[in-house]
């Protein structure tokens, strides 16, 4: 988990989903 919870769409960009 990280600071990407706020922006689900944009955050997943740098995540390994």
Curated annotation (Swiss-Prot):
InterPro entries in UniProt: Gastrin/cholecystokinin_CS
Post-translational modification remark: Sulfation enhances proteolytic processing, and blocks peptide degradation. Levels of sulfation differ between proteolytically-cleaved gastrins and between tissues.
Recorded GO MF terms: hormone activity
A Gene Ontology cellular-component term: extracellular space
Domain of life: Eukaryota
GO biological process: response to food
Modified residues (Sulfotyrosine): 12
Keyword annotations from UniProtKB, A to Z: Amidation, Hormone, Pyrrolidone carboxylic acid, Secreted, Sulfation
Modified residues (Pyrrolidone carboxylic acid): 1
Primary location: secreted
Localisation per UniProt entry: Secreted
UniProt modified residues of type Phenylalanine amide: 17
Residues spanning the membrane: none
Keyword Secreted in annotation: yes
Coiled coil: none
Protein role: Gastrin stimulates the stomach mucosa to produce and secrete hydrochloric acid and the pancreas to secrete its digestive enzymes. It also stimulates smooth muscle contraction and increases blood circulation and water secretion in the stomach and intestine.
Similarity-based family: Belongs to the gastrin/cholecystokinin family.
Protein name (record): Gastrin
Protein species of origin: Macaca mulatta
Gene expressing this chain: GAST
């Amino acid at each position: 988990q990280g600071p990407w919870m706020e922006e689900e769409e944009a955050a997943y960009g740098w995540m390994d989903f």
